[in-house]
Amino acid sequence: TTIIYVIVRFIFCYGKNVKMWGKGILRLAVSSVTGLCMAAIVFLPVLHVFLSDSRFNTPNKMGLVYPFSYYAKLPGLFIVEGDNFWTCMGFAVPVLLAVLLMFKSRRKYTMLKTYFIISAVMICIPFFGQAMNGFSYMCNRWIYSFALLCAYILVCMMPRLITLERKEIRFIGVALTIYFVVCMCVKYSRNGKLISAVAIGAILLIGLSIKNINEYNRCMMVTVAVMLAALANGIWKNASFGENYAAQCISVKMAQEDVFGSEKELISKDAEDTDFIRYSGSGLSYNMNCITGISSSNLYWTLTNPYVSKFRYDCAIRLDTLLPHKYTGYDDRSSLIALSSASKYLVSKTGGLVPYGFTYESENDDYVMYNNDNALPLGFTY
């Protein structure tokens, strides 16, 4: 996104002046190299790990277009909370009014309009999402740059937004109505969150159309609209009549039990008198080895070794094969578990099968632990 920003800015600032282009590129190159040299002690190791990451080296499908549902959700997602290929926008409704006012202004804000149109095109084409994500998979995590642009547009348009003329009010009102009708006609954008956001925008527009209100109070109206939009998004996200996201939360006590609970307790007791122990199983917690200090067969990190993912793929391990950075055991295969030097196998009492060659050892309230009769030492497999 930075490269696109610089290119567009150079075009608008320098035009066809080749000399200024050369000076600008040279100055930018020197500054970039200087910055990279200053950050090399951190940048180079991270770059090395990133380029050798399993997700970066794993072939991924690249579609020419997103699914239809993606495009159907986009209009509503501009002003309401939501996630669609990590296209998280959910801007406050005054941003929509500012964008409409910007495009109403002829021969003004050309650079901002260009940035907005380029960003909109990038959101609609999967290639840009994949390119911005290191060519690993389609994902619009770069959307924070678009959010920064929209915030800047609101700041630039604020003086005009609080001093709207009649023609501008009519234009924004008609455009807001068309936007609302389009969203209501599309199933994927039709929801209570959008109705609340548009209602806040309509009330704000009516308030800004009143003439005998000073500029300070108009600014306060916009601020209140931003706060109400954020509050409405939060209510629809967490309330029981909305997505009920808050119901997924647990108490601090339950969180501590999940993190330091029975899995850790059961395996830690058995590992007290052992120099090395590795365990596998079903229904286990990811990255529990960070807490227990005991090696396991479950892993879920952003950056992982590509050779491990290739080994799992070659062995046709079906569990989470589509996520090369997420390992879930060894498909409960006795041979692979033995080759991984796993001497213990844990099964959740809520469900799970025990592979061949394991005998019962102990249990607690949530897990049953089995001993591997065919365990191999760590050095045997390396």
Where do the PLM segments sit?
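Perimembrane helix-loop-helix junctions
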Residues: 2-34, 200-209
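Short secondary-structure boundary/capping segments
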Residues: 2-5, 48-62, 133-136, 241-249, ...
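Periplasmic/ER-lumenal interhelical loops and adjacent helix-loop junctions
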Residues: 24-28, 32-115, 119-140, 144, ...
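C-terminal, active-site-flanking charged/polar segments
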Residues: 54, 58-61, 144, 148-154, ...
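Contiguous transmembrane helix-bundle modules in multi-pass membrane proteins
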Residues: 111-127, 131-259
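Soluble catalytic regions of membrane-associated enzymes that act on cell-envelope
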Residues: 221-382
